[in-house]
């Protein structure tokens, strides 16, 4: 799916982010630093990682600047409220940068942190895929601690099965 309009992309991205926020909002405050295994991402690490890569990697590269990814450590934001605020702030800053792009800029090349040249619209699409990947991790981690989560698109698989013709 090629993206030819910045506004179209931003509209879609806001919908994707809304779905991500709904699941992030399910993280229990007291479990923000929980992980399923030592050395693996905590909930806070995942949220900080999504926020920092969006702002300092994807947005910077999209406007044809080098990545400035600072990692996902506690020094960026610690505790539930700070982590959520960090995500909101990084998203707002990213949107400001994305809005500086014109539709023609989507066809330009940018350089990824790995040194690959990629068309800007493809780079932005990979940001969406990256977010969906980590959203899936959050869903799985929440299921491991028995937290009920919202269906991604309004229906569960059981709802779809029930409403399907057989």
Indicate residue ranges for each PLM-predicted region.
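Solvent-exposed, charged/polar functional surfaces in cytosolic regulatory/catalytic domains
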Residues: 19-22, 26, 89, 93-100, ...
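Short, contiguous alpha-helical
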Residues: 10-14, 18-24, 31-73, 111-166
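Extreme N-terminal tail/first-helix region
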Residues: 1-12
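A short, structure-level motif marking secondary-structure boundaries and short turns
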Residues: 4-6, 78-80, 122-125
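Helix-adjacent hinge/juxtasegments
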Residues: 59-102
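Generic recognition of short, well-ordered alpha-helical interface segments
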Residues: 8, 15-18, 45, 78, ...
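Acidic catalytic patch
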Residues: 98-114
């Amino acid at each position: 799916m090629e993206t030819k309009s910045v506004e179209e992309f931003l509209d879609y991205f806001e919908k994707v982010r809304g779905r991500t926020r709904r699941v992030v909002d399910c993280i229990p405050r007291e479990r923000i630093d929980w992980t399923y295994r030592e050395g693996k991402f905590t909930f806070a690490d995942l949220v900080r990682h999504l926020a920092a890569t969006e702002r300092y990697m994807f947005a910077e590269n999209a406007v044809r600047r080098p990545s400035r990814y600072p990692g996902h450590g506690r020094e960026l934001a610690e505790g539930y409220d700070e982590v959520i605020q960090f995500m909101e702030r990084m998203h707002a800053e990213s949107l400001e940068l994305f809005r500086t792009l014109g539709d023609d800029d989507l066809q330009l090349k940018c350089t990824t942190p790995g040194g690959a040249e990629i068309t800007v619209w493809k780079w932005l699409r990979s940001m969406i895929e990256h977010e969906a990947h980590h959203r899936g991790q959050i869903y799985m981690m929440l299921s491991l601690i028995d937290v009920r989560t919202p269906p991604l698109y309004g229906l569960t698989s059981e709802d779809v099965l029930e409403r399907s013709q057989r």
